[in-house]
Amino acid sequence: MKQLYLLLITLLVSLSAYAEKSGTCGDNLQWKLTDEGVLTITGTGEMQDWHKSKPSPWHADKSVKQVIIGDGVTTIGSSAFSDCDSLTSVTIPNSVTTIGSSAFELCFSLTSVTIPNSVTTIGYYAFELCFSLTSLTIPNSVTTIGSGAFFSCFSLTSVTIPNSVTTIGSSAFAGCSSLTSVTIGNSVTTIGHGAFYGCSSLTSVTIGNSVTEIGYYAFSGCSSLTSVTIPNSVTTIGYYAFSGCIYNHRTTKTNQKYPSVNL
């Protein structure tokens, strides 16, 4: 009888452990995690949002190496894959329109991500502290890059902001110390406060001709940046926007507010 009791207990524990490897993550979404570390999200509609006090059901399992999000999923929930420090690969389908805040925060092993043409919003701190992220493609569908979206992605070397983007949030690329060049598309109107703060390897920046505001500390601490051309559209440059970096700046001849300076 005792042996039978122990056998039943062992079986229940095993079933419980198995049950924790699958479940729901939205009204019409399901998730499943294999022993090989492949996490699959299937179904239709929005993914649930999570936060630090209520993390995702797979958060405690540090074996997640690959995430496959099925076609039909429309949002990636806040903090959905936060702290999945073994994650190296993620597949995002064309049905996704929003990448939630802190969605991939602290994914230390993630090296590249392709954001599909359906995504319009990259939430704040979405890829914060993804230390290994070297490759990034932002499609023409994105209109908003949230505050701190790529904060301290130390390995990121270059980025092109497409013409669809209108706002680059505060600290969006701050601390990206390997970033050497930035091209800002012609639809961007605002470069947020500290957007590229501390990008110490940044040597080249092209500012599109629709930018009206460069926030305070926007390029502060970009010690390798020696020159920048400010278009005629700019009417506001925040304090310390270029502190600790450029020795000269150029503006278009018709810009009456900010004359060219060569120190």
Language-model region placement:
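Sec-dependent signal peptide recognition
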Residues: 2-8
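N-terminal signal peptide c-region/cleavage motif recognized by signal peptidases
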Residues: 14-16
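Boundary of Sec targeting at the N-terminus
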Residues: 18-20
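Surface-exposed ligand/attachment interfaces on beta-rich extracellular proteins
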Residues: 22-30
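A composition-driven surface/loop motif
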Residues: 25-26, 48-54, 58-60, 68
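STAS-typified acidic loop motif
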Residues: 29, 35-49
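Structural signature of tandem-repeat unit edges
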Residues: 38-44, 62-75, 85-98, 108-121, ...
